[in-house]
């Protein structure tokens, strides 16, 4: 993750490409993803992460007008690239959890 003025470059570990997003949006999503994964010990799917973000935003009374799914995958990929999240396949399903 590279930070420039009010932007963060998010790295996709699959392609090696970077995409810049607003740093406040990055913080919002990374905190939500971290909080969701902190509660899960076994690992959860991407769909469960997105649903958890929506619930987190609702609980916190956060209104977000952009695509939650797009930002969720972008920030999640950056967190994987920075070794905050680990992913693995189990019975044909990709699971995610915080790296120990």
Regions found by a protein language model. Give the residues of each.
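A short, conserved structural fragment
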Residues: 80-90
């Amino acid at each position: 993750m590279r930070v420039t003025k009010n932007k963060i470059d998010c790295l996709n570990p699959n392609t090696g490409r970077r995409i810049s997003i607003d740093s406040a949006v990055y913080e919002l999503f990374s905190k939500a993803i971290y909080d969701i994964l902190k509660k899960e010990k076994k690992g959860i799917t991407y769909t469960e992460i997105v649903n958890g973000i929506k619930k987190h935003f609702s609980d916190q009374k956060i209104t977000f007008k952009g695509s939650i799914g797009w930002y969720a995958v972008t920030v999640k990929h950056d967190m994987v690239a920075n070794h905050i999240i680990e992913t693995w396949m189990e019975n044909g399903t990709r699971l995610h959890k915080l790296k120990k």
